[in-house]
Curated annotation (Swiss-Prot):
<dbReference type="Pfam" id="PF00014">
    <property type="entry name" value="Kunitz_BPTI"/>
</dbReference>
<dbReference type="InterPro" id="IPR002223">
    <property type="entry name" value="Kunitz_BPTI"/>
</dbReference>
<dbReference type="InterPro" id="IPR020901">
    <property type="entry name" value="Prtase_inh_Kunz-CS"/>
</dbReference>
<dbReference type="InterPro" id="IPR036880">
    <property type="entry name" value="Kunitz_BPTI_sf"/>
</dbReference>
<keyword id="KW-0677">Repeat</keyword>
<protein>
    <recommendedName>
        <fullName>BPTI/Kunitz domain-containing protein 5</fullName>
    </recommendedName>
</protein>
<dbReference type="GO" id="GO:0004867">
    <property type="term" value="F:serine-type endopeptidase inhibitor activity"/>
</dbReference>
<feature type="domain" description="BPTI/Kunitz inhibitor 1">
    <location>
        <begin position="29"/>
        <end position="81"/>
    </location>
</feature>
<feature type="signal peptide">
    <location>
        <begin position="1"/>
        <end position="20"/>
    </location>
</feature>
<keyword id="KW-0732">Signal</keyword>
<dbReference type="GO" id="GO:0005615">
    <property type="term" value="C:extracellular space"/>
</dbReference>
<keyword id="KW-0964">Secreted</keyword>
<dbReference type="InterPro" id="IPR050098">
    <property type="entry name" value="TFPI/VKTCI-like"/>
</dbReference>
<feature type="domain" description="BPTI/Kunitz inhibitor 2">
    <location>
        <begin position="83"/>
        <end position="141"/>
    </location>
</feature>
């Protein structure tokens, strides 16, 4: 058990900084919220992705510096980052009214396969990788996915997308494993 923990920790220490430095491999979404500073420009409302919660939140950007985890529109934040969030079925609601509604069919974007898949949403919480229809999931998350026929060869863009999905999955796995071990 300790050996597995050490191996995961080493992978985590090596891979996370590399990924955070690379915009194309989820680095933008892994960065913390950074409001910038007030030394220039005027403040504006933006959205950032909270990687811990898998959700996009609104914040005030002060106009200078900051980092790239900043989106003008919530839909851009969701399609760039939340579509990569791991499936979260939600939790049972404390409110009696919500509990009576029961579980609902929802769709999430599976970044491994690049497809929108059905799941049962319990009713409260969860993250932004949750859509009321397969169509809305595709519209937000699949719109930029490369389309190719079965006979065509993978392009560098396809390879990059698949590598991103694999790296995001590895990150999620390491993060979940490190939580269980600690």
């Amino acid at each position: 058990m300790i050996r597995l923990y050490i191996q995961c920790l080493i992978l985590w220490i090596i891979i996370l900084p590399l990924l955070a430095a690379r915009e194309g491999f989820g680095g933008r979404c892994l960065k913390p919220k950074d409001k910038g500073n007030r030394s220039c420009g005027r403040s504006q409302k933006y959205y950032y992705f909270n990687a811990e919660k898998g959700r996009c939140y609104r914040f005030t950007y002060y106009g200078c510096k900051g980092n790239s985890n900043r989106f003008k529109k919530k839909s851009d934040c969701v399609s760039s980052c939340a579509c990569q969030a791991v499936l979260d079925h939600g939790s049972h609601c404390k409110s009696k009214a919500k509990r009576k509604e029961g579980s609902k069919v929802r769709y999430y974007f599976d970044s491994e396969s690049g497809l929108c898949r059905k799941f049962w949403y319990v009713g409260c919480g969860g993250n932004h990788n949750k859509f009321t229809s397969k169509t809305s999931c595709k519209k937000v998350c699949v719109k930029d996915a490369p389309k190719r026929s079965k006979s065509s060869k993978p392009t560098s863009k396809t390879f990059s997308k698949n590598a991103q999905y694999s790296m995001n999955s590895l990150l999620r796995m390491l993060k979940n494993l490190s939580k269980k071990v600690m």
